[in-house]
Regions:
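Short alpha-helical transmembrane segments in multi-pass integral membrane proteins
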Residues: 1-27, 84-151, 193-249, 305-370, ...
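Residue-level signal for short hydrophobic patches within transmembrane helices
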Residues: 16, 20-39, 43, 65-72, ...
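Transmembrane helical elements of multi-pass membrane transporters/channels
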Residues: 25-44, 145, 179, 208-212, ...
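Transmembrane alpha-helix boundary and packing residues in multipass membrane permease domains
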Residues: 30, 34, 46, 63, ...
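Helix-terminus/linker motif at the lipid-water interface of multi-pass membrane proteins
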Residues: 35, 39-57, 126-133, 189-196, ...
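Small-residue-rich hydrophobic transmembrane alpha-helices
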Residues: 56-116, 153-172, 279-343, 374-396
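Short runs within selected transmembrane alpha-helices of multi-pass transporters and secretion channels
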Residues: 77, 146-164, 172-180, 201-216, ...
Length: 462
């Protein structure tokens, strides 16, 4: 099959397949990828928790570094991916290659800068992310290999998102799942069999992500994608580079504020000792796993929304958003029910310390209620980002961990003490829900009007 044939087949798949079947086919591998990624994050928490409470706290500190890596990768991946998908929807394959190449090589450059700066200032960097003096040696040992692999990790996120936006979620899944499973297998080998401790967890993450990078790059080099990577295709137009940054701004805001929010959470929790930092870290990792389901369904929506918006099939964009809302809510209800009935056992699985459990358990229960609001937040943000409404998408992306969370984490612990630390995230989620809902409802009505206008201008069928 020629490149042109693949492009035509992909166009018909994305614009004609019934919405429920299309989204589920794209969401299933994405959800699996997200779950595996979350599981290997939980595996790090589990194995590092076997060392000490201070080592367990290091996971929370380094998670803020991971959020920075994700912020850069998702900014370039989502930013180029939404443009690529819309260009493919309008059948412009040359532009797709141009934007793909630009984002990939930019990701490598950003990763090198992060690695150099991070390694040169490592102890101060870890303290800035919320480490205590007792956590610091573990955090530095854990972060060092991850920083070395940062260029490949950021580039992998770009490739993964481009594959998804092309509608090739199965190929994206192969790279991420392989890396995730390898990470889970390598953790105990490096940490305990080789006696490397927390440094072993970092080495396992870096090595598995390097292999994931190689697998994803192979997909592009072997012509399994419509867009391709060519250094000669990197855009020379500042306007196009700014389009990538604007399209990725919601992801950068979301992930960047996740890093800042995590840092502030660690700083607020460390006033109550290493057990508080470890407890909040465990809760955050568990809910990253739960939220990965909603985000996975939302990522199944993104290429569908982008492709069909570019093809001016607005009714399909609306149907896709509504179906995603329903599917994400049902899946979250099931997950929360299971976790609620096993809450204490779940927390003790990662660190069997009464002090850690005393902090984590109330925070976990508060979060269980708030997480059911996430489908509206996720669908609103991802829909706007996918159709190129960068301003609205960026604002909503900044609400959860920025506009709502940061004022709360600065005020509530001073007023309510440790309870304030535990309540910040669920209250921020509730506020973000009430902000996102009217934006989403208004846009769904707008899509309906745009579809009617498009139908009225369509040529009569003979």
């Amino acid at each position: 099959m020629t490149q042109q044939d693949r492009t035509v087949v992909q166009y018909h798949k994305m614009t004609e397949t019934p919405i429920p079947r299309l989204i589920l086919s794209l969401a299933a591998p994405t959800i699996l990828s997200m779950l595996i990624t979350s599981i290997y994050n939980l595996a790090d928490t589990f194995f590092v928790g076997r060392i000490s409470t201070s080592a367990s706290g290091a996971v929370g500190v380094v998670s803020s570094l991971m959020a920075i890596i994700q912020a850069l990768g998702f900014m370039l991946g989502h930013g180029s991916g939404t443009i690529i998908s819309r260009r493919l929807g309008s059948q412009d394959t040359h532009a797709a290659t141009r934007f793909a190449s630009t984002s990939f090589f930019t990701a490598l450059a950003f990763g090198v800068v992060l690695a150099v700066v991070g390694l040169a200032t490592l102890p101060d960097f870890m303290m800035l992310l919320g480490s205590t003096e007792t956590i610091l040696p573990h955090a530095c040992a854990y972060a060092r290999p991850i920083l070395l692999a940062a260029p490949l990790m950021i580039s992998s996120l770009v490739m993964n998102n481009i594959l998804r936006y092309e509608g090739k979620a199965n190929l994206a899944m192969i790279g991420l799942v392989t890396g995730g499973l390898l990470n889970i297998a390598l953790d105990p080998l490096f940490m305990f069999a080789l006696g490397l401790g927390t440094a072993g967890a970092g080495i396992a993450t870096a090595l598995s992500q390097t292999i994931s990078f190689g697998i994803l790059l192979y997909m592009f080099l072997r012509g399994k994608t419509v867009s391709q990577f060519r250094l000669s295709a990197v855009t020379r137009e500042p306007r196009e580079f700014l389009q990538i940054l604007a399209g990725g701004a919601p992801s950068f805001g979301r992930q960047g504020l996740n890093s800042i929010g995590g840092m502030l959470l660690n700083i607020a929790a460390r006033s109550y000792g290493d057990a508080a930092v470890a407890g909040m870290s465990i809760v955050s990792r568990i809910f990253m796993f739960i939220l990965s389901v909603a985000i996975g369904v939302g990522q199944g929506l993104q290429p569908v929304a982008s492709f069909n918006y570019g093809a001016r099939k607005y009714h399909r964009v609306r149907q896709a958003a509504i179906f995603t809302l329903k599917a994400a809510f049902v899946l979250l209800v099931v997950l929360i029910a299971v976790c609620w009935w096993n809450d204490e056992a779940l927390i003790r699985l990662f660190r069997d310390d009464p002090e850690v459990t005393a902090v984590a358990l109330p925070a976990f229960r508060y979060q269980c209620f708030a997480v059911l609001l996430q489908p509206v937040i996720v669908v609103a943000n991802m829909t706007f980002q996918s159709v190129g409404k960068a301003g609205r998408a960026t604002f909503l992306a900044c609400c959860r961990q920025g506009v709502c969370f940061i004022p709360l984490i600065l005020v509530l612990p001073r007023v309510l003490g440790l309870v304030g630390v535990e309540l910040c995230q669920p209250i921020a989620d509730a506020l973000t829900f009430f902000i996102s809902l009217p934006f989403l409802l208004a846009f769904l009505r707008q899509l309906e009007q745009m579809d009617k206008a498009e139908a009225s201008h369509a040529p009569a069928q003979l």
